[in-house]
Amino acid sequence: MSSKRAKTKTTKKRPQRATSNVFAMFDQSQIQEFKEAFNMIDQNRDGFIDKEDLHDMLASLGKNPTDEYLDAMMNEAPGPINFTMFLTMFGEKLNGTDPEDVIRNAFACFDEEATGTIQEDYLRELLTTMGDRFTDEEVDELYREAPIDKKGNFNYIEFTRILKHGAKDKDD
């Protein structure tokens, strides 16, 4: 009977341990990048991201988040946000994104010459006037790290790769 109890306890603990499986979703360099991001957000260095940490981090980026916005962000986590929870949340978000070919094909609809690029002014117009409209500030933020050549061509193939795999392979 005690062996049955042990199995029952193990089964009950499984959901808590399942978060550690998130480490298998990312390679070592990605985990290191997430750790660096976590440490930048964890302003008070207590090993947890709290509402004040989020506020300070966003303020350092020139944002002035409301309490409601911060509460909504904090409520996305089922409990305290330590590094494992942070990684789990990112894993869930990344798994929730569309497959790479779906994203690339969405951009390709606006690339009539099949060059793999879209003129940045045309893409800005599309993003600010169609569907879930972006603000000019949101487009500016997107373009800040986007692969745009000197002629103003947004490379959506490279952008999609960065979106799904990160910028780490850029030098490879």
Curated annotation (Swiss-Prot):
Protein name: Myosin regulatory light polypeptide 9
Record: residues binding Ca(2+): 42, 44, 46, 53
Organism: Bos taurus (Bovine)
Broad class of the protein's primary localization: cytoplasm
Chain positions covered by the region annotation Disordered: 1-20
Keywords per UniProt: Acetylation, Calcium, Cytoplasm, Cytoskeleton, Metal-binding, Motor protein, Muscle protein, Myosin, Phosphoprotein, Repeat
A Gene Ontology biological process term: actomyosin structure organization
Biased composition (Basic residues): 1-16
InterPro entries: EF-hand-dom_pair, EF_Hand_1_Ca_BS, EF_hand_DJBP, EF_hand_dom, Myosin_RLC
Subunit: Myosin is a hexamer of 2 heavy chains and 4 light chains: interacts with myosin heavy chain MYO19. Interacts with LUZP1; the interaction results in inhibition of phosphorylation of MYL9 by DAPK3.
Domain EF-hand: 29-64, 98-133, 134-169
